[in-house]
Amino acid sequence: MKLHSQFLKLQSHFGGATEISVTMDELALIFGCTHRNAMHIVNKMMLQEWIKWTPKRGRGSRSLLQFLVPSEEIALQSMMQAISRKDVHNAIEGIKTHASSTSLQDTLQGWLLTYFGHHSEIRSDKQIDTLRLPITQQLHTFDPLYMNLLAESFVSSHVFDGLVKRSGEQDKIVPCLAHAWEVDESRTLWTFFLRKEVLFHHGKVLTAKDVVYSLGRLMQTSKRTLYSYIFKEIQRVTALNPSTVQITLKQPNELFLPFLCTSRAAIVPRDLEGMDEQSFGRRPVGTGPFKVVDMTEDTCVLEVFPYYFQGRAHLDRVEILYVPWDTETSSSDTGSAFHVIQNPSSASSSTWSRIHSESSIRKFVTCNTQKKGPLSDPLLRAKIVSCLKDDSASIEQEAIIDQEITLQISTIPQYAGDADFIATRLEQQGYKCNVISVSPEEFKGPIRLESDLIVFSLFRDEDEQLRLFDLYLTLSQHIEPHTRADIEGWLYTIAREPNPVARAESFSIIENRLIKEHHLHILYEKPTQTAYLPSVRGVSFNSQGWVDLRHVWFPPLLSSSSTS
């Protein structure tokens, strides 16, 4: 690998020339080594027949160096060696280094894809099935209290369970850790009856005290997290006996039971089994079908939990790797490319079979009218929002402003491209823009109230109503008082409406009001997809539109010679 890198560094230094005149001292400077070591490197490259070296006698004399192979070939060899060693990180770094060559990048990505997908081997007459998945979001924690990313929620959904869950059929909520539940007439006293002998990954039995601890962590946190408006409505949680939990709400909230289906409400062992929160987030202990056995900056490894109370998963091992380039564009038929891949490109090969989940992502921009500035003027706000519409090219010249206005646009790194698009459209109409991109954690802070425009997204899945409630509650903090009062009134009604259809109608009223008053502008919406090859069996979705790995399986190997 080192010799490969030295060759690529050398050729890059001379701009891809095929023949150069150079001294050994100059080569030593390029390699960052001694004159003697530079000679060794040159000799090694000659033995590999990568270069031809015609020396000139005398120290300081300029010798002739000819490159016999293109850099693409050496880069490919280097990446292949990294992949064969399962050194995905170095393989990816190599691809990023040579990203300027489209053909090389496509070739290297195609080879890297052979690492992902389904891999089976026979051990002690048993087929061991491993699924390797690439993700484009770096994983930080699986602690239900601290998760921010959808990819983290995806892993968490296979490591933890909640008291209840969604069935995926007609928005129905069904038992999970609790086999039954009751609610009193006031809709504030909820009683959950736990299954017996449910095991955590470390072998301890789940009890009501674990539920009390898990919900208590949410109640006591000072962090502003997704769905905090729900769990802050919990007045107390009581363990009536080892298998019965009673939850008292401060006031009725029909979104409480749906909230208990989310990964935020997952049940963890009490006191986190003595671990600090950071350690627990990277090596969590849950009751789910898979357990985390390893986690680094780039890799998360799950192994099946054979004693899962709802039945053992078919897969034995899942390796999830952070891949910081777009894997969607590489779907060539390499013989063992992706079997399961999130968000496939619409240009993917026709050999891929596709199914669609019901989830989608909506990108939007909101206006902060609480901040003293141009957006507090309804007419100017309308002009600014009109610049973002598809037909903005036809805006009359009078829309061009005659005074200098600078707008601050805030977002998170994942949506920086959308923020830049907005800035470009506005700058075309004479507005100056300053885009600020901060981490999801910082985004929850004062940065939003200091900005004029805020770019974010709504993940539309079976938890959409929970997300909408959170979204509109947040938006109400930076809009005019009279509109805020109306929104808070609608949200109060929604929280007490048991019919999800009626709740959806109220959410639509809020959306239409915000759009009409130019507080909200929807940029676009696109569906999420899952592509799979015919060899995959049991593909189904959880409530967030992710593939449920517990049900995925592959046909058995016909013989040991079929291993990959």
Regions picked out by a protein language model, each given a short descriptive name:
Residues 63-64, 228-272, 294:
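Surface-exposed binding/hinge segments that line
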Residues 138-152, 204, 256-263, 531-550:
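A structural "hinge/loop" feature
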